[in-house]
Amino acid sequence: MTVRPILRYPDPRLTMAAAAVSAFDAQLRALAGDLLDTMRAAPGIGITAPHIGVLQRLTVIELSAADGVRTYVNPEIAWASADLARHDEGSVSMPGVTETLERPARLRVRYQDVTGASRLEEADGLLAVCLQHEIDQQIGRASCRERVLVAV
């Protein structure tokens, strides 16, 4: 696989909504592999295709080696808890910039795997935070961007 260049904020592609993936083929699996290699090189724990300029709804997350790699195609939040949790968040597109955000503590995500099979997953803790952050990125919402000028 390949480490690809990561777009840096304020690249306008980072605020554009990504299109749904419709082809579940070798090209999609290769893109997922490139995202994983790029995320590890950054380093980071989550990355979406828009981070590398590909406006498709594909996310790769690896919280730790023990947790393994998770790949989400066309993810969407199906349910979110009313209880909230605060976490510091950053982005591979804005190195060194973090922001403390309050988000739902638990959620259920509907997505497809790289073969196109439909999945439903419950998440809490860091996984819930990472999923919400990356889904925001895919719809063109980069939560930390308002802090960029403070960090520069």
Model-derived segments and spans:
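Positively charged
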Residues: 1-147
